[in-house]
Amino acid sequence: MENSKLSDRARGIDLIVYDFDGVMTDNRVVIFQDGAEAVVVNRADGLGVAHFRDLGIPQLILSTETNPVVKARAIKLRLEAITSCKDKKIALKSYCAQNGYDLNKVVYVGNDLNDLEVMKIVGFPVAPADADPKIKSVAKLITKSKGGEGVVKELSDYMMGS
């Protein structure tokens, strides 16, 4: 990605991919009597997403969840989302091939074991502070923020050299 506003860290990124639960949320869910679920997100992450969008960096949410809250948040953030994904590695490889993205130029933010294999194939794996230790072991960046506490905003600040 060529853009004069990009820092050296952000230059060359083809795509940023986020897991949802445990990255944009604190991994907790509220279940109502009717079975509906709700999560809490951090508005600062919305600022991080907007910053990357303003710089022209494509972004994607990739989740195994079937919960409609993931799609609702993606719509609010104006992000594409792949949900109900059985194998994130296969899904991301396919998505990148279809869209001409180089996996070596992909940033992937994940927190749990279902992110491990996909994090091994991207160029820049990122983990929240409270990620599973196996995830942290493959991450090139571990944020100071825990999941749901501004991980995406912190990544945005880091990529822009702030």
Residue ranges and their predicted role:
Residues 1-20:
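Non-catalytic pre-domain segments flanking phosphatase-related domains
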Residues 19-21, 45, 111-115:
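Acidic active-site catalytic centers that drive phospho-/nucleotidyl reactions
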Residues 23, 49-73, 82-83:
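Substrate-recognition element of Asp-dependent hydrolases with the DxDx(T/V) motif
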Residues 24-54, 64:
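A positional/architectural concept
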Residues 35-39, 81-82, 89-162:
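Mg2+-dependent phosphoryl-transfer enzymes with acidic/Ser/Thr/Gly-rich catalytic loops
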Residues 42-49, 66-71, 84-95, 113:
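N-terminal active-site wall of soluble small-molecule enzyme domains
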